[in-house]
Amino acid sequence: MSNRVIIFDTTLRDGEQALAASLTVKEKLQIALALERLGVDVMEVGFPVSSPGDFKSVQTIAKTIKNSRVCALSRALEKDIDAAAQALSVADQFRIHTFISTSTIHVESKLKRSFDDVLEMAVNAVKYARRFTDDVEFSCEDAGRTPIDNLCRMVEEAIKAGARTINIPDTVGYTVPSEFGGIIQTLFNRVPNIDQAVISVHCHDDLGLSVANSIAAVEMGARQVECTINGIGERAGNCSLEEIAMILATRKGLLDLDCGINAKEIHRTSSLVSQLCNMPIQANKAIVGTNAFSHSSGIHQDGMLKAKNTYEIMTPESIGLNRNNLNMTSRSGRHVIKHRMEEMGYKPTDYDMDSLYEQFLTLADKKGQVFDYDLEALVFMESQAQDDDKYQLQHMMVHSDSTEGVATATVRIAVDGKDITEAATGNGPVDAAYNAIARATDRKINITNYKLSAKGEGQNALGQVDITAKYNEQMFHGVGLATDVVEASAQALVHVMNLVYRADKVADFKQQIHKERELGGV
């Protein structure tokens, strides 16, 4: 049996289902490119039949990614498989992942069919998907609660039908490691054609056991683990990719298994997903939490000074978290910035040097010292800008009356290149700025969530503002970054306004198509 574990990332499919606001196509592509750099073998990037937006994002990613296999999800229905195949057809290499429920409660209560009917649907779906590709994965949804005889039968028939990967999900995070490992062991003992497929696992974290269950399965012969960055996903989340990768690396002597993950990209990828998805990483999160390499106990600190491996089983550098605290000032030249970006793993094509250096100088004049995390924050914000932004914040001035609690804000916004200046009052400077921006853009949206976080350390740290806004029953996520909280808040709102504008244009386009079809049918 191979000692290579295939890493199947589903951040952009299962992970995205946990978000309050959907990612844009551009944001999904950013994450896909980061996953490719990370070295994932397979990335599941969407459910094409679910919406035109998901179809487009799958197609865009499939067209761009070259070094990882792109996968799309489909139910055991021909229309789903058709949509997946069509969206993936532009890829160099792709996988169709089809699934159906197999547990008694799902078969009887959700599908309202007999197990034999479900078995037939599964076989037909796999055979149909094989018309488009040899790489077909089949999942037994809720396998963790499926009677073992039925599960063995389903796996055997799916392999006979042509599935080359069989996924065994613990869909509701119900099993414990000994139990889940036992399921995998039983499949290897009882399914006669098990050697013709890779056995995969997809574990959820409802009881906090997703990683432990996945490792138990791997020890019993599973050779694909489905996971997400930072463990994001439905309900309590999914198996965490970074934890699986570092378990395999750190305990190689015990497990004797490898995966193709470039561990030095873990920190960077984790931060990107956290920012784009507006999902903070808890401080004590294994591998990527801010406390993961912190030592506060005096005994621990003393041990660390004598020998780092007394209390560290891996190094921050091993996941790409550089301890180099070299600071840069406005006197630092372009070559210094370029060197620091290279040290952090960025290629020249990942950012615009002219734009980055200009922003760096502006920030250095404000802060005095600029650190690595500042540069990464600037690159992230630059990546959020769109060439076709309708609204651009040019200038803002705020006056606050501390005695009355009333603030006045004046903003100048370029709308399609034409400057518009508006002023408004509000209950505090942020509220005033938001009211002024609403006037300038002639749009009123409902802010449902506002979050402020520091990007960096000390009193001069950059402030990142994330907002979730509701407009026409759709949710949008905006982000802003500045040394001033009010400015960062204004940037976040303008970001949302541009997303809303593009959503309106798409809606108008769809409506026009609908009208043309109606006229054509008359």
Swiss-Prot record:
Entry GO terms, CC: cytosol
Binding site for Mn(2+): D14, H202, H204, N238
Catalysed conversion reaction: 3-methyl-2-oxobutanoate + acetyl-CoA + H2O = (2S)-2-isopropylmalate + CoA + H(+)
Positions of region (Regulatory domain): 392-522
The protein's required cofactors: Mn(2+)
Family matches, as CDD domains: DRE_TIM_IPMS
Assigned EC number: 2.3.3.13
Subcellular location field: Cytoplasm
A Pfam family the protein falls into: LeuA_dimer
Top-level taxon: Bacteria
Keywords: Amino-acid biosynthesis, Branched-chain amino acid biosynthesis, Cytoplasm, Leucine biosynthesis, Manganese, Metal-binding, Transferase
GO biological process: L-leucine biosynthetic process
Pathway connected to this protein: Amino-acid biosynthesis; L-leucine biosynthesis; L-leucine from 3-methyl-2-oxobutanoate: step 1/4
Chain coiled-coil ranges: none
UniProt domain Pyruvate carboxyltransferase: residue ranges: 5-267
Cited InterPro entries: 2-IPM_HCS-like, 2-isopropylmalate_synth_dimer, AIPM/Hcit_synth_CS, Aldolase_TIM, LeuA/HCS_post-cat, LeuA_allosteric_dom_sf, LeuA_bact_synth, PYR_CT
MF terms (GO), sorted A to Z: 2-isopropylmalate synthase activity; acetyl-CoA C-acetyltransferase activity; manganese ion binding
Family classification: Belongs to the alpha-IPM synthase/homocitrate synthase family. LeuA type 1 subfamily.
Chain's role: Catalyzes the condensation of the acetyl group of acetyl-CoA with 3-methyl-2-oxobutanoate (2-ketoisovalerate) to form 3-carboxy-3-hydroxy-4-methylpentanoate (2-isopropylmalate).
Subunit description: Homodimer.
HAMAP family xref list: LeuA_type1
Protein name, as recorded: 2-isopropylmalate synthase
Gene: leuA
